[in-house]
């Protein structure tokens, strides 16, 4: 019997795949557990429509990420911090502080987990910080740490 998998089933198939399985296995296990549905022409059409919808959404997310990348690369975020001799900061600037400053200064809300700061910023000056907006899109944000007076 041909079935469409609704969830990944170890050793049998992945979500969205159409496979041939034993009738008893399909009726007694896959259908009852909600892991698969019968591969009727209507269900196959619905699956194709679902896949197209997901592709459109993925393309839209990628386009939005590219647009946001262009915006971010034009901006400079300024963060005031207390510093000692030689421009070393008391404490450090974290990705959370960068995200908060970005929202306060430019009105762009960005998740701090998307800001890929290898180590916290510990000195005054300009730093280029990578921001992963999408698996395929990484922007570079300029962060200016200036001395707080």
Swiss-Prot record:
Q: What does this protein do?
A: Binds to the 23S rRNA.
A single GO CC term for this protein reads:
ribonucleoprotein complex
Quote the protein name from its UniProt record.
Large ribosomal subunit protein bL9
Has keyword Hydrolase?
A: no
Extract the NCBIfam families matched here.
L9
Q: Name one GO biological process term.
A: translation
Residue stretches in coiled coil: none
- Name the source's superkingdom: Bacteria
Q: Tell me which species this is from.
A: Geobacillus kaustophilus (strain HTA426)
User: Which Pfam families is this protein grouped with?
Assistant: Ribosomal_L9_C, Ribosomal_L9_N
Q: What is the lineage of its organism?
A: Bacteria, Bacillati, Bacillota, Bacilli, Bacillales
Q: Which InterPro entries match?
A: Ribosomal_bL9, Ribosomal_bL9/RNase_H1_N, Ribosomal_bL9_bac/chp, Ribosomal_bL9_C, Ribosomal_bL9_C_sf, Ribosomal_bL9_N, Ribosomal_bL9_N_sf
Q: Its family?
A: Belongs to the bacterial ribosomal protein bL9 family.
Q: What's an example of a GO molecular-function annotation for this chain?
A: structural constituent of ribosome
